[in-house]
Regions:
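Consensus positions within tandem repeat domains that build extended binding/scaffold surfaces
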Residues: 13-16, 36-41, 63-65
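Structural signature of tandem-repeat unit edges
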Residues: 1-11, 18-34, 44-59, 70-84, ...
């Protein structure tokens, strides 16, 4: 498993992909409303995350969801949500070295 495309999911469960070193790219579709705590914890090879949803908040992204992922990963977010998503993602474990862009 290298790519996860979640067009039909509404949530990524708690610790769903924890320590899965085969995951390299994740695309979170518009339907994904929540990301559980430690959902991608320890996914050291996760290099790209694409977020298409515009409704995520600090309450809908669980603690440590991205802790232990590749430090210099690229995260693509909707342009109108760049600032707020950057704050949320950094609080939820995305490294400060990561590139978060629209």
């Amino acid at each position: 498993m290298t790519t996860i495309w979640s067009a039909f999911f509404t949530a990524i469960g708690k610790a769903a992909f924890k320590k899965n070193v085969k995951v390299t790219k994740v695309t979170l579709g518009k339907n994904v409303k929540t990301i559980g705590a430690k959902a991608f914890y320890g996914c050291k090879k996760l290099r790209t995350v694409v977020i298409k949803n515009t409704q995520m908040t600090g309450k809908t992204v669980g603690s440590g969801a991205f802790t232990g992922t590749y430090a210099k990963m690229t995260v693509k977010v909707p342009s109108k949500k760049l600032k707020s998503y950057k704050t949320i993602l950094l609080k939820r474990g995305v490294s400060k070295k990561a590139v978060i862009k629209k």
